[in-house]
Regions:
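Conserved SAM/AdoMet-binding glycine-rich loop
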Residues: 3-6, 218-350, 355-360, 374
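Glycine-rich beta-alpha loop elements in corrinoid/cobalamin-binding modules
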Residues: 42-155, 437-438
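Terminal RNA-binding accessory module
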Residues: 407-491
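Catalytic cores of alpha/beta
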Residues: 110-118, 283-287, 358-376
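Canonical Radical SAM [4Fe-4S] cluster-binding loop centered on the CxxxCxxC motif
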Residues: 172-212
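N-terminal [4Fe-4S]-dependent radical SAM core
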Residues: 10, 137-183, 192, 227, ...
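Alpha-helical interaction/regulatory segments in DNA maintenance proteins
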Residues: 517, 528-550
Length: 550
C-alpha cells in the first residue's frame, strides 16, 4: 500500500510548520503509516502548485492533506493551502481514501480580523477532528476508530522516530528545522485567553517524557537534519513542571539542553508565558542561564503580551498585566542579552500584540504605544514585535463576543511600528553584526533576500546575485523596518563592486566609483574619499565581528 501526504502547512499558537519549519503533524502521520509498513510519499503544497501536480495522486491508496492557520502571519518560505486547493486536490483524485487533518478542520481563514469558516465536507472521506496520527495508526488495522480521538505520548513514542524518515523528501532537505513537540495544551489553571485555539486543538495540558523527545531528536539527526526548535509548547519554560509541583524544572532543563546539543547545529525555542517568568523569577533566571549556555544565538522567547491595555487584558483573560510584561522583558534581557562572537544576542524576548480583542477602544492603541516607548527608552531589546488582528474560531470567547474592529486605528498603528521596528533592529543587529549561513530564498533585481535557519530569522537583503537556496555569510550594513541590508562576508574591498559599495550608508555612487577606480587598494587611508567613508570601510574590513559605533 502507498500513501501520499500533502503538507498544506500549519501555524498555530504553539506550532509552526511553514518552510523551513516542518511540523510534528506530518512527521507523526508518516510515522503512523510506516508503523504499518505503508509506503509514504511527501509533497508540500508549493510543490503541487509549482509542478502542477493537482491530479497526480490517483495511484495511491491514501491521499492525506494536513494544514491549518489559526494565527495570522506573513510567510516567506511558503503559502498555506486554501480551501479551494483542498477541494481541487480531492476532486481531481477520486481513487484514494481522502483524509483531511490539522487545525484547518476547526475552521479556515488566512486573514486577521476575520471569523473562520467551516470546511466543506464534500469530496472528503474523513475529516479528522482529533489527531491525524491517531486516526492513521488505528484505521489501517481496525474499524474501531474515532475521528475525535487525541494521541497520547505513548503512541508518539512509537511513531515519532519512524516519521523522521519523511524529512528526506522535503524539497529543502536538509536545510529545514524540525518543530519539536514537548507538551500539548496550556498549563494555565485559571482559564484560557479569549482567542486561543490551543485548548481546542490540543485539549488538557500534558508533557512528553524527556527520553522520548531525545530519541526522536536523534532519529531526526540520523537522517541528516540538525536544526531543532522547541516550538510545540504553549509555554516552553513550564516543560517538566508537572513533575515539580508546577514549578520550573531546573534539572530536567539541564538534561534537555546538555543532551539536545549533541544532535543540534541550530537549537532554538519559541513560546514562553511572561506571567510564568514573573511568578518564578529566581528559578526562571537559572533556566535562562541553561538555555543561553547551550543554544544558538538569535534565539527568541515569544511573549503573548497581546495588549498593554489592562482593561483588554482582563476582558480577554490574558495572563499577564502590563507592568509584569515589562519586568519579564527586563529579565530575559538581563540573562539573554549577551552577544556571541558574531555580535548576535543569544536570547531575546519577542512580543505578540493582538488587536480586535474584547474591550478594545481607540485609547488601546495609544496605551500600547506608550509601553513600547518605555521599552525603547529603557534600552531593552526585543527581537521582534508581531502586530496582528485576531482570528475568531468557533469555541472561543472571541468568536462568541464578536467585538468591534478598529481598522483605521490598526492601520495607523502598523505605520507607527515601521519606524519603531527600524530603530529596534538597529539596536539588535548593529552595523558589523555577522550572520552565518544565510540561505537565499528570493532575488529582486540586485538584491538577494535570505534568512538563517532559526526561530523568526531576520529577513536579510544581501547586495549581489546569488542562487536560490545558496548559503552565504553576511555583514550587516543597514536597517529597514522588517529586514536588514548586508554585504557578503568577509568584506573584500578589492572585489566589491559599485552596487555593494554604494549600499553602505554614507557612501554614495560617486564615492563608490572612486573606490573602484583606486583598485587594487592596499591602504584605506590613502583613498581620496572623505574621512567618514574611510572609517566605515575600515570598520567593515577590520572589525566585522566587533560591535561598536562607526
Amino acid at each position: 500500500m502507498k500513501a501520499v501526504i500533502i503538507d498544506g502547512y500549519v501555524d498555530e499558537p504553539a506550532i509552526l510548520g511553514v518552510p523551513p519549519y516542518v511540523s510534528p503533524y506530518v512527521r507523526y502521520a508518516a510515522g503512523a503509516l510506516y508503523y504499518h509498513e505503508i509506503d509514504v510519499d511527501y509533497y508540500t503544497i508549493d510543490q503541487v502548485r509549482d509542478k502542477d501536480l493537482w491530479q497526480s495522486f490517483n495511484h495511491y491508496e491514501y491521499l492525506i492533506i494536513i494544514g491549518g492557520v489559526t494565527v495570522p502571519g506573513h510567510y516567506m518560505g511558503g503559502t498555506p493551502i486554501s480551501l479551494t486547493e483542498i477541494d481541487k486536490l480531492f476532486s481531481k483524485n477520486r481513487e484514494p481514501l481522502k483524509v483531511l487533518g490539522g487545525s484547518i478542520v476547526k475552521g479556515y481563514t488566512l486573514k486577521g480580523g476575520k471569523a473562520a469558516i467551516p470546511v466543506n465536507p464534500d469530496n472528503v472521506d474523513f475529516i479528522v477532528n482529533g489527531d491525524i496520527e491517531k486516526f492513521l495508526y488505528v484505521y489501517p488495522v481496525s474499524d474501531d476508530y474515532n475521528l475525535n480521538d487525541k494521541s497520547d505520548y505513548d503512541l508518539i513514542s512509537k511513531i515519532a522516530p519512524l516519521g523522521a524518515q519523511i524529512l528526506k523528501q522535503h524539497p529543502r532537505y536538509p536545510d529545514i528545522i524540525a518543530e519539536m513537540d514537548l507538551s500539548r495544551g496550556c498549563e494555565r489553571t485559571n482559564g484560557f485567553c479569549s482567542f486561543c485555539t490551543e485548548p481546542l486543538i490540543s485539549g488538557k495540558y500534558r508533557e512528553r517524557p524527556l527520553e522520548d523527545l531525545l530519541i526522536e531528536m536523534k532519529a531526526i539527526a540520523d537522517v541528516g537534519v540538525k536544526n531543532f526548535r522547541f516550538g510545540r509548547a504553549a509555554n516552553f519554560l513550564a516543560y517538566g513542571s508537572k513533575l515539580n509541583n508546577g514549578k520550573p524544572n531546573i534539572p530536567l532543563f539541564q538534561e534537555l539542553y546538555s543532551e539536545a546539543v549533541k544532535f543540534a547545529e541550530i537549537l532554538h525555542t519559541d513560546n514562553a508565558n511572561p506571567a510564568y517568568i514573573i511568578k518564578h523569577k529566581n528559578d526562571i533566571k537559572k533556566l535562562l542561564e541553561i538555555i543561553v549556555k547551550y543554544n544558538t544565538a538569535g534565539d527568541i522567547l515569544s511573549f503573548g503580551v497581546e495588549s498593554f491595555d489592562e482593561n483588554v487584558v482582563r476582558k480577554n483573560r490574558v495572563d499577564i498585566f502590563p507592568e509584569e510584561s515589562i519586568e519579564a522583558i527586563r529579565i530575559v534581557n538581563e540573562v539573554g542579552g549577551i552577544r556571541d562572537e558574531n555580535g548576535i544576542p543569544k536570547l531575546l524576548p519577542g512580543i505578540n500584540l493582538l488587536f480586535g480583542l474584547i474591550g478594545e477602544t481607540k485609547e488601546t492603541f495609544e496605551i500600547n504605544k506608550r509601553y513600547l516607548e518605555r521599552i525603547m527608552k529603557e534600552d531593552l531589546l526585543v527581537r521582534r514585535i508581531n502586530v496582528r488582528q485576531a482570528m475568531a474560531f468557533p469555541g472561543t470567547l472571541l468568536f462568541k463576543e464578536k467585538p468591534k474592529q478598529h481598522k483605521k486605528e490598526f492601520r495607523k498603528f502598523k505605520e507607527y511600528m515601521e519606524s519603531y521596528n527600524h530603530e529596534m533592529l538597529k539596536k539588535v543587529f548593529p552595523m558589523g553584526s555577522i550572520l552565518k549561513n544565510v540561505i537565499i530564498e528570493e532575488i529582486r533585481g540586485k538584491i538577494s533576500f535570505g534568512r538563517q535557519i532559526g526561530t523568526y530569522p531576520i529577513k536579510t537583503g544581501i547586495i549581489g546575485n546569488f542562487n536560490i537556496f545558496e548559503k552565504t555569510d553576511a555583514i550587516v550594513i543597514d536597517h529597514g523596518a522588517r529586514s536588514i541590508t548586508a554585504l557578503k562576508y568577509p568584506f573584500d574591498i578589492n572585489n566589491a563592486n559599485i552596487n555593494e559599495l554604494s549600499a553602505i550608508p554614507g557612501i554614495g555612487k560617486k564615492t563608490a566609483e572612486k573606490i573602484v577606480l583606486s583598485k587594487p587598494i592596499t591602504d584605506i587611508s590613502k583613498l581620496e574619499i572623505d574621512d567618514t567613508a574611510k572609517r566605515k570601510i575600515s570598520f567593515l574590513i577590520k572589525n566585522g565581528s566587533i560591535i561598536k559605533s562607526v
